[in-house]
Structures are given as C-alpha cells and as structure tokens.
Amino acid sequence: RDVERSRGLGDVYKRQIVQSTTYVYDSSREIAEVFDDPTKSLIYSRFENPTTDAVEKKIAALEGGAAAMCTSSGQAATLCSILNICQAGDSFIASTSIYGGTINLFSITMKRLGIECIYVDPDATDDEIQAAFKDNTKLVFGETIANPALTVFDIERFANIAHKNGVPLIVDNTFATPYLCRPIEWGADIVIHSATKFIGGHGTTIGGVIVESGKFDWKKSGKFPQLTEPNPSYHGVSFADAAPGAAFVTRIRAILLRDTGATLSPIHAFIFLQGLETLSLRVERHVENALKVVDFLNKHPKVEKVNHPSVSDDPSPVSYTHLRAHETSLHL
C-alpha cells in the first residue's frame, strides 16, 4: 500500500488504464533528453506505460527488490533475463528441475543462438555444482518451487556458489509468489515471474515480471560488458553507471523491449493490479486446499505417489527454511 500513499484528496481510487502509445512533452529539447537517457522510458509504450509502472513498483516492493519491469509473458521474462547478459559463445547453469517450456528454451532455442545451458541436479553437491562452471558461464538459474515436480530449490546454497564465481543467481518465483518466499532475502539477484499464474490468478491474462535486487555488483567480475561498457545506442552510456542498482532491468527495457517488443499491455497491467490485491488471500486458500488434497491422496490405495514438499522424501530442511512451513499450491 505504500506505493499508493502519494495520492491526494479527490484522486481516483483505482489506477487508470493509460491506453496511449506516446506521451506529451513541452519542447523538442525535452523529448531529445528523454530519448537519449535510457533511465527515462516514458516515451513510447513499447518501453513503459504508467499503468505498467504501477504493477512494477508493487511487485518490486513485494519481492523486496530495487526495481522491476513487466514483459508480455513469463517466457519473455525468462528469455530477456538470459539474453540480457549472455551472447553467442557464453554458457549458463540451470537446475534440472524446472518448467518444461523453459527446458525447451534453454536446450534448443538457446543452443541455436550459440548459448550453452549446463544442467545440474538441484541435489548435487557443492563440488558437483562448481565443476559445471566454465570461464564463459554468466549466470545460474533455478525455480523456487519447480513446475510441475514441486521440488524446492536451495536458493541460499546456489546463490553462494554463483557469487563465489562472480555471476548472479536468477530465480523463477512463479509457484511460490512473494507471499510464500522472497528469493532476494536468500541471496537471489534477479527474480522472475509468470504473472499469468498466481499474480493474475484468474486465467484471463498473460504476462511476466523481472525484479532486480539491486545488490549485485555488475562491474566486479568483468563478465558483463553489456551492462558496464558504453552502449552505442545511447551515446556511450554505461547502464551500470546510469542506473546503479537497476542496471539489469534498465538494459532490458532500453534494449530488449525495444528490439523484441515483448511488452505488457496497459489493460493486462490493470488486471494484474487487481490480482495483486487478493494475492495473499488466494494463495492462502490454495495452500489450505492443497494440503487437504495431499492428505486425501496419501491415504488412497490407488495413489502411488504425491509430489508435494510436505510429503517429500528429502529430509533436508530447505523447504521449511525458504517457504512458509511447506505451504505451496498442488499440481498433480
């Protein structure tokens, strides 16, 4: 609610849908300044829109991040997050326990772009994970709660290993939502969502979100020239210098949304704003219902196995630590 407290007496109660492609400025000089500054994106709705901005601010606050940006889908959020710091000849590491569509993106599409995905078992030892790193490895990727296996990802352990190697940890927090887990608190540097699922909550709207923690030092390792070196599209601006704490999402907005058009529409942003208002209530009920179904299926003689953190064979306390007491939605 803090995001909304700047409203004055007589202001509209709900955020308006700003269905506009462009925005008004008083002079050509002002327009030129905005176009030349990658941190000022309210020039064309392919980059930014006031309704979308409201969603971004709320989700950044919920995740405890420094900045956020929306995309046209969860898959677009994943794609943009990888392409933002990886290029042909690079590699990255991903957990084997992730969404099937993401595996297809990583194993087939990224391979065709010259980017290698190296998979590691989420239960691998630290030494086994370390062995997967190469000189050209740019990031580590995992899902808080895997889709659909519901495996719980040890965010803190993978974050420590990633940081030891000078690269960020990107975590897909779609299934957990910030109500059940805030990956940034456990060391994640970038958090992404398919807002289509629990943020929207009603099966009507496709969208994605990318949240930046603001804590990762993009300059330290020298591995991320996309963020640290002068960008020719913006007269030699370095994103790390121009947007400290938000360089990652600023570059995606300025470069990848410009080039791919993977932009969330204002109407969809408005629907996500409505979904966020009931997120905690809905997730709480999902959890309650899921545990009842788990209990029923566990006792059913014709059910061989139920995938859910509360009945995991793994004695590890990870799911208790990162989630709220095994609370998660159920997928069969």
Region locations from a protein language model:
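Conserved PLP-enzyme active-site core in the AAT-like
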Residues: A68-N298, N307
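Conserved PLP-binding catalytic core of the aspartate aminotransferase-like
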Residues: K305-R324, S329-L330
